[in-house]
A protein has these predicted regions:
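A charged, amphipathic alpha-helical module
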Residues: 2-125
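Redox- and metal-dependent alpha/beta enzyme cores, enriched for Fe-S-associated oxidoreductases
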Residues: 90-168
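A short, acidic, amphipathic alpha-helical segment used as a generic capping/interface helix at domain edges
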Residues: 158-175, 192-196
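Conserved beta-strand positions
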Residues: 181-184
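Acidic, metal-coordinating catalytic cores used for nucleic-acid/nucleotide bond scission
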Residues: 186-190
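Peripheral docking tails and interdomain loops at the edges
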Residues: 195-214
Length: 214
């Protein structure tokens, strides 16, 4: 049988931390008046990197560095992807990957810039990435943490706080005045909170747009 390779595990853990640092940097950049990492690249790329890769491939860090250079260059130049940003939006709910181009339509047709999405808001803390006896023990807790905070599970499992309350915190952090809410007709976890989202958005003066799909 195969033996567990701690050297390989911690090499992967370092790449996971690298991806986490980049994700946090992109979120911070998107909280400014000139967001650079938006739309399908944020959602699809983060989904693939977190769920499909999770540090296993050595190809991702060089790609991340290249993306970061482009994003930083655009931020310094204050580049915009539309002539005018009418609204800054958080994209919430379970998105349809097959029509992800709607994020581009939001920018180019309506001037709504999607700052981040629910499925991309996954792990934000560093895991142990140095091979020591203590970290070998910590690794099991880190792997459990990454599974607990996987896409969808970290929002639809954990109750009201992670699904509703934290949405308003993200709106404040990202300076968002709109929520584009994917309403997956088969996803009962979010459908059951329909009234709560609508009521609390009205109280906060945040525009809430429901986009139905299945």
């Amino acid at each position: 049988g195969q033996h567990w390779d701690w050297s390989h595990y911690f090499a992967c853990a370092r790449r996971v931390n690298d991806a986490t640092r980049n994700r946090l940097a992109w979120l911070e950049m998107n909280s400014t008046p000139f967001p650079q990492f938006v739309g399908a690249p944020f959602s699809l790329y983060n989904d693939t990197n977190y769920m499909g890769n999770c540090g296993r491939s050595e190809k991702f860090p060089p790609i991340d560095r290249k993306i970061m250079r482009y994003a930083e260059r655009g931020s310094r130049a204050r580049r915009m992807m539309a002539k005018e940003y009418r609204h800054r939006a958080i994209v919430w709910g379970v998105q349809p990957q097959y029509c992800i181009d709607m994020l581009n339509w939001m920018i180019h047709c309506w001037g709504i810039v999607p700052l981040t999405d629910m499925l991309s808001l996954v792990n934000t803390r560093m895991i142990a990435d140095t091979d020591t006896p203590e970290n070998r023990e910590q690794a099991f807790y880190d792997m459990a943490w990454l599974n607990e905070n996987m896409i969808m599970r970290n929002r639809t499992h954990g109750g009201y706080k992670v699904l509703v309350d934290e949405l308003w915190e993200f709106c404040e952090t990202m300076n968002a005045d709109m929520i584009m809410m994917w309403e997956h007709m088969s996803c009962k976890a979010l459908t059951g909170m329909h009234g709560q989202f609508a009521e609390q958005a009205r109280e906060r003066g945040i525009h809430l747009v429901w986009v139905c799909h299945d």
